Amino acid sequence: MLTCYRYIELNPVRAGMVEHAADYPWSSYRFNALGQDNVLVVPHDEYLKLADNAQERQLTYRALFNNHLSEKTLSDIRDATNKAWVLGSSHFKEKIEQQLNRRISPAIKGGDRKSAAYRERVRINGV
């Protein structure tokens, strides 16, 4: 979840609109990292778990921005967003897939369509 926070709050930086996430006026970064009031922001439980008090939470949150998001992470988030896939652990994806009763990640491609293993996978997964 916090990786997605970082992805969103760094979008204006990656786009060259600002030099730092705090410089973008519509970002939640100033609330999350600097403690500025914003009636539009409702802190997520994962954010609240960063520390027991607001000052330490903000310090910890700012520290998350010391490291860049990897190209793979950026690609994974973009793919999930653009293709309506679910992003998360295997357990989380399975849970969501069961609740929605539909595939929420890319289908397995290729394979020998005449093989018993392929036909069984199709029967089980509907792929």
Where are these regions (language model features)?
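Short Pro-Cys-Gly-centered "Cys-loop" motif that presents a nucleophilic cysteine in a tight turn
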Residues: M1-V127
